[in-house]
Amino acid sequence: QNARQLLNAMARRADRHPPKPGTSPAESFHFHRQTQSRRARILGMLLVPLEEDYEIPLRRAPDLRLACTEAYGPGEGQALVSLRELLGLVGAHEWRKNGIVVPALGDRIHPHYGVFSPIRSEYVDLVADAPLPSNALAFDIGTGTGVLAAILARRGIARIVATDQDPRALTCARANLERLGLTDRVEVVQA
């Protein structure tokens, strides 16, 4: 809680200096991006120490060992991590644990750290409602969480090949499809 308050105070201080107006839209955009970059750089400088097992050796620090292990794998020594990174990691851990309701699926998807989360439903609804040319075979390229493959399987597609390049996404998609009971119709493949 204190760390988040410190980060918010730093953000408020960084936001005191708005970008200067440009003489053209392109220059205004450049100044805006420059200000955003400076803000991100400053906020990224607040570092938190981690022990080998991801314990935070600070008084009253929360236990983030499980969240860190899910995101980074086994610990490999002491490290310094940006507080913003740790806060994102905690959010990803909560999403993974609780899942995100996907109305078009009628179920929850549990995104893993580093895998795009289906929080905007427009593209999911499009796949859920679009007419399908065939029920025999579909491909989900860049499957991520596997949400689109799951929707296609629930719509009656006989065989779906879901691909991704990221090992985290492949692990995430497999876990979601297994939890949803759809592994008999969806094959998850490394691209």
Protein language model regions, located:
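Conserved SAM/SAH cofactor-binding pocket of Class I
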Residues: 120-191
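N-terminal auxiliary segments of SAM/dcSAM-dependent transferases
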Residues: 2-100
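SAM-dependent Rossmann-like transferase core, predominantly class I methyltransferases
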Residues: 65-137, 141-143, 147-148
